[in-house]
Amino acid sequence: MSRQAWIETSALIECISEYGTKCSFDTFQGLTINDISTLSNLMNQISVASVGFLNDPRTPLQAMSCEFVNFISTADRHAYMLQKNWFDSDVAPNVTTDNFIATYIKPRFSRTVSDVLRQVNNFALQPMENPKLISRQLGVLKAYDIPYSTPINPMDVARSSANVVGNVSQRRALSTPLIQGAQNVTFIVSESDKIIFGTRSLNPIAPGNFQINVPPWYSDLNVVDARIYFTNSFLGCTIQNVQVNAVNGNDPVATITVPTDNNPFIVDSDSVVSLSLSGGAINVTTAVNLTGYAIAIEGKFNMQMNASPSYYTLSSLTIQTSVIDDFGLSAFLEPFRIRLRASGQTEIFSQSMNTLTENLIRQYMPANQAVNIAFVSPWYRFSERARTILTFNQPLLPFASRKLIIRHLWVIMSFIAVFGRYYTVN
């Protein structure tokens, strides 16, 4: 595929979900002539025989979707999509660096206002059940908005892992008194507008410096207009074995610092502060004996990965080990996953995606080298798989090639998200 064809295809992927929203069961008017020719050329290049939106306007993209999913799932046919020449230049093929990404793939922040206006009211680009219509004037403002500045509920990013229980599920434990002789217990939980962390203790804790580890799913958060104070409440229940009424004359009882800011923040102060939770830890300095403590940071939270090029280059994923699905791709994959579950094909497609991903990595490695990579996350968790690819131990695979692999896999996943919603079992 030539560079120009690739650029056209990338642009098409950005808005292809719009097709389904502009057609009814009797009419289909979502495509321009340029869209049709670009999509037809693409389908011809990947050898998809039947192009549904041309020969059956009553079921747009459906026949093509079935062909495409079959194409992805068949080991002997999907090799074309994995070849490095998807990234070839017309003049000088070069796949060992990410110059192609930096130069030819348009970063999010350089997108023109007209592009934003074109997409801002497309229902299918919004995974919410009730799409929000945004006026054209607000659309212009949105085009100049800081990426990732949309408020986020800290509870929505909380997760459980092998060694850490979930968020709400900690409520019962926090509201149960510690048994006699129990060790001190540190915790970090979140409500809709706050993060609460601290240490529960049966005995007074001497003044000192203490470190609260921040889980990866909270380490991508910024908070602005924040106030910091002692509390003993979580989701309407009392946190046991914490003290909220300690005094230290006119001096602060405790301060906190975060790795991204050297200034201490006073706990129980009227100060309004902004801080980032990246860096992996919150440092608590106490000035008096405390029989346990719980500190709340209450404010407006948002994602702190505001380096827009990371949308394509994933540079943010090299900075922190986040497991948040920060691209929102899972929501677009959900219609396809529902269809897979209904047809009993979930497992076989999952195996196909694992095989496809391993074959893709093999394309970027020297010949006859084993791909010893194990994915612990399902195929539809794109950012977690991206992190695994970026960090897995393979010295023969340079970092630049890993970024290309992820960009390559991102495009394949985008195709699945687009075409999968029309997939039907033959």
UniProtKB/Swiss-Prot annotation:
Tell me the leader sequence span. Answer: none
One GO BP annotation is: fusion of virus membrane with host plasma membrane
Q: Does the keyword Protease apply?
A: no
Q: Where in the cell is it found?
A: Virion; Host cytoplasm
Alphabetical list of Pfam families matching this protein: Phytoreo_P8
The GO terms describing molecular function are: host cell surface receptor binding; structural molecule activity
Main location (coarse class) = virion
| GO cellular component terms, semicolon-separated | host cell cytoplasm; viral envelope; viral outer capsid
The UniProt keywords, alphabetically, are: Capsid protein, Host cytoplasm, Outer capsid protein, Virion
Top-level taxon of origin: Viruses
Q: Which Gene3D superfamilies match?
A: 2.60.120.170
What's its job?
Capsid protein which self-assembles to form the outer icosahedral capsid with a T=13 symmetry, about 70 nm in diameter and consisting of 260 P8 trimers. Mediates the secretion of assembled virus-like particles from host insect cells.
Q: Name the protein family.
A: Belongs to the phytoreovirus outer capsid protein P8 family.
Quote the subunit structure annotation.
Homotrimer. Homomultimer.
- The protein in question is named Outer capsid protein P8
